[in-house]
Amino acid sequence: MAQEMELAIPIMEKAAKLAKDGQTFIILGSLYLSEDKLEEAVDAIEQGLKKGKVKDESQARLTLGQAHFELQNFEKAKKEFRIAARDDDKKIKKTANSWIKYTENEEIRVKNLALRRDYIQSQG
C-alpha cells in the first residue's frame, strides 16, 4: 500500500496543478497525510481550499485540522475543527467536536510534559 501511495503522489501533484477546482489538492493532501508528510498535507489542502470548488469543504477542514494536530499546531487545528463543526451534517459536526476536545486535552498533556521535563532538568 505504501508503495502505491508513493506512486500516486507525483501523479496527483501534476493533476492538482492542472485541475480547475481544488478537489485534487484535497485528495493530494490526504495522500500526504497518510504518508506522514504533514507540512505537504497542510500546503496541499490549503491550496485546494483557496482554489475552491471542493466537494466536501468540512471534510477537507477536518483533514487539515488533523495535519495541524499531528504537527502540534493545536490552535490552527482547533480553528479548522471549529469551522468543520458548523456543518449541517451531524456526523461531521460530531467528529469535529470530538477532535476539538481531543486537541484541547492533547495540548494540555503536551504542556504538562514540557513543564515536567523543564522541572527535572532544573533539578539535575
What do these predicted ranges mean?
Residues 2-3, 35, 71, 107:
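Structural motif corresponding to the intra-repeat A-B loop/turn of tetratricopeptide repeats
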Residues 21, 57, 93-95:
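Residues that mark the junctions of alpha-helical repeat units in TPR/alpha-solenoid scaffolds
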Residues 78-124:
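Terminal, low-structured helical/coil segments at or just beyond the last alpha-helical repeat
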